A protein has these predicted regions:
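Conserved HGGG/HGGXW glycine-rich cap/lid loop of the alpha/beta-hydrolase fold
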Residues: 18-71
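A catalytic-pocket lid/entrance helix-loop region that shapes and gates access to the active site
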Residues: 123-163
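Conserved serine/cysteine hydrolase catalytic core
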Residues: 194-263
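Catalytic histidine neighborhood in serine/cysteine hydrolases
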Residues: 262-275
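Conserved hydrolase catalytic core segment
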Residues: 52, 92-138
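Conserved alpha/beta-hydrolase catalytic His-Asp/Glu region
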Residues: 157-214
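Active-site loop/oxyanion-hole signature of alpha/beta-hydrolase fold enzymes
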Residues: 56, 60-97, 138-139
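Post-His helix in hydrolase/transferase enzymes
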Residues: 276, 281-296
Length: 302
């Protein structure tokens, strides 16, 4: 397999963070992944736009090759880590791109540290916090909550599993297809390989279940409600997948939720990826659709 797109480094601190740099641009976009993922989720973006734009991919605490403490997980902790990374990189401010939970981290960073965040790219993440109690939820809100819970349950399940080979890990994600790593596009294969660490008896996902289970309620309880989003003072690009976690499922950000975001946020660019789901939107065929609309020219300078 070819050399990695990323040059990896460690950001010092009480919780050491792994980052990857793609390209040498002086103003890189800082990329934040989902709740059980890692920075290689942005491989396609790094391949197509790293050389010209410059990207920094982050392994959030508890994921990838970053440290995995037993406690200390929350949106606030991740936002503080983002600023620590900017300090390490010598950046006074940066554009943040966040997929899934990474979108919530990006929003929290913009609210907590407005002078450090110049623009946000929300990739199927960062929707408003639901303020209704379960008994007050509409039927649509209940269905959305159930779909989110089902998607997270599948992602969390693998964190307790040991796989005898990388191919067995692919069987978890693509059941019945008998795939080998060589069958996948190179950037996707690299994502799955980096996602695994060797353990006794085989391979295990690097993401910490403790981290994921702590961050999940933090997202649902401390992310901004629609009105609180008015505190985000920077321009926003919103990229949505037309499907949720599973093919054919309802999108995580529906048209109604999008309308709730459009009022308080300064959304300069909006893209709906027809045919993409929450995961495949980062694959090459869809990255080639949304990334030029965001980066070429940069939406925040239009």
């Amino acid at each position: 397999m070819e050399e990695s797109l990323w040059k990896t480094e460690r950001v010092p601190g009480d919780v050491k963070l792994a980052i990857g740099r793609a390209g040498e641009g002086p103003d890189p976009v800082v990329c934040l992944h989902g709740i059980t993922a890692q920075h290689r989720a942005f491989n396609a973006a790094a391949r197509y736009f790293g050389p010209s734009r410059g990207l920094v991919g982050v392994d959030l605490r508890g994921r990838g090759d970053s440290d995995k403490p037993e406690s200390g997980y929350s949106l606030e902790a991740h936002a503080t880590d983002v600023v620590r990374i900017l300090d390490y990189l010598g950046l006074q401010s940066a554009v943040l791109a966040g997929h899934s939970m990474g979108g919530f981290v990006a929003l929290k960073s913009a609210l907590m540290f407005p002078d450090r965040v110049r623009a946000l790219i929300l990739l199927d993440g960062g929707w408003p916090r639901v303020e209704s109690t379960p008994s007050e939820m509409t039927e649509e809100e209940r269905q959305e909550a159930a779909a989110l819970e089902a998607g997270l349950a599948r992602a969390f399940k693998r964190l307790d599993m040991t796989f005898e080979s990388p191919e067995a890990y692919l069987d978890f994600w693509f059941p019945g297809q008998n795939l080998k790593m060589d069958d996948l596009p190179r950037d996707l294969a690299d994502y799955y390989l980096y996602d695994l660490g060797e353990v006794e008896g085989g391979y295990r996902p690097k993401a910490s279940r403790v981290a994921a289970e702590a961050d999940s309620p933090s997202v649902s309880s401390t992310s901004p409600a629609a009105e609180e989003m008015r505190g985000v003072g920077c321009p926003v690009a919103l990229v949505r997948a037309s499907q949720g976690f599973f093919p054919g499922s309802d999108p995580l950000i529906s048209d109604e939720v999008r309308d709730m975001m459009a009022g308080p946020l300064d959304i300069r660019t909006e893209i709906l990826l027809e045919g993409a789901n929450h995961y495949t939107m980062l694959w090459p065929e869809y990255t080639r659709v949304w990334a030029p609309e965001v980066f070429d020219p940069p939406f925040w300078s239009r």
